[in-house]
Every structure is written in C-alpha cells, then in structure tokens.
A protein has these predicted regions:
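Short, positively charged, Gly/Tyr-enriched micro-motifs
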Residues: 90-145
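Short, conserved DNA-binding cores of transcription-related domains
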Residues: 1-102
Length: 145
C-alpha cells in the first residue's frame, strides 16, 4: 500500500498550489507498521509547517512587491531567511532585503519587507508555553521535593 499526503494552498485569487509532504509504503500489516511511525509523524508535521510558512510569507511578500507610490516592483538586494522557533520546531522564514524605489527620496536605500511583522525569533505561542511552564515549575505546588 502506498500513502501520499499532500497539502493544498488556495490563494486569494483561487490559484491552487500543491505539495506532497509525505509518502509512505507499507508491505505487510504488523504492529511495527500500523499507522505512522514517530519519524513519519515528525516528517509530516515539518513538511506541513514548512509549506504553510513559505506560502504565508510569499503571499505577503508578493502583495508588498510593488511600490505604493509609483507601481514599480522593488528589486532584490539579497534573498535571506531568518530562523524562527515555533511550537512545532524551527522554520526558515524568507526574509529578503529589497532596494527602495527610486521615487522614494528619504530613508534607507534598502529595506526588509518582513520587518513589520517579523519581531523576534520565537513565536508568541512558544514564548507563552515556555513562560507558563516556567511559572508552573517554580510554583510550590508543582515541586516534588
């Protein structure tokens, strides 16, 4: 038996983009082959997380690519990425640097379009879980000794 897990992203304009995130093959049914292994489950989650992050960021970048003042596209200075820690592990977030449009005469010559929302390198949900876990571990009722 072959199983293929695919993620489908439907953009605002109705375009579908597909990506296979996991493919597994099972020959015989046995306790060892029942369901997903831990490794397969982690690979599935990582594949979905990476794809969703890439689609979200790329759609956001595409909306910002055109200069608000004159309509020309911002050219790329460099195409970097930033590692971000999430509840499900580390992901690489596209974080390009673009040249400011020639119609803009003030400010730096380059900018990062993700600056408005890419604050820090840890997701708020992970920070919340880490701090609530720390509070619990320091609380007298959670101490074991």
């Amino acid at each position: 038996m072959n199983v293929h897990v695919e993620v489908v992203c439907i953009t605002a304009d109705g375009t579908e983009q597909r990506r296979e995130v996991l493919g597994i093959e099972r020959a015989e049914l046995a306790m060892e082959t029942l369901g997903l292994s831990l490794q397969e489950g982690k690979a599935l989650l990582k594949g979905v997380q990476d794809w969703v992050v890439a689609q979200q960021v790329n759609e956001n970048l595409e909306r910002q690519r055109v200069c608000k003042h004159c309509g020309r596209r911002h050219s790329t200075k460099d195409a970097g990425s930033t590692p971000v820690k999430t509840v499900f592990g580390r992901v690489e977030v596209p974080n390009p640097r673009w040249h400011r449009c020639t119609c803009e005469t003030t400010g730096a010559r380059t900018f990062r379009p993700t600056k408005a929302w890419l604050q820090g390198r840890t997701s708020p949900e992970l920070l919340h879980l880490e701090t609530s876990g720390l509070r619990r571990s320091l609380s007298p009722k959670w101490r074991t000794c």
